[in-house]
């Protein structure tokens, strides 16, 4: 499937020693905009046809790239960063089973999935 967005997740310890995280959208598909808070509020949408357990790559992007600089960086504080890449929605295995076996899944069963890929973290230490 095509890509919806690329995110950078920053983690750090606050003054009380509690872990914190912040998500930054760094690249988004389909001409959507990233707001001043570092997030894109517009969803990519979905082309999933649950009845046929299919989708089309008519939304999203085949590739995304970006240059990003942490707007909250403080050289005196440790942090970690990792990248998360999110695909457009596609049929979940339950949709394929429903079609193949001619059954009806209960309404509470998810029929789509949005797959994600994660990188290993990069650790910053002020020492």
Q: Model segments located where?
A:
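C-terminal functional module detector
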Residues: 1-127
């Amino acid at each position: 499937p095509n890509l919806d967005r690329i995110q950078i997740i920053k983690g750090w310890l606050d003054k009380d020693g509690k872990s914190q995280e912040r998500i930054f959208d760094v690249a988004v598909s389909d001409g959507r905009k990233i707001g001043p808070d570092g997030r894109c509020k517009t969803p990519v949408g979905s082309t999933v046809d649950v009845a046929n357990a299919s989708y089309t790559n008519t939304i999203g992007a085949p590739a995304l790239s970006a240059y990003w600089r942490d707007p909250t960086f403080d050289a005196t504080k440790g942090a970690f960063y990792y990248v998360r890449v999110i695909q457009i929605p596609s049929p979940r295995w339950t949709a394929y089973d429903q079609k193949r076996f001619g059954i009806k899944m209960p309404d509470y069963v998810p029929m789509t999935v949005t797959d994600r890929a994660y990188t290993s973290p990069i650790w910053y230490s002020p020492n």
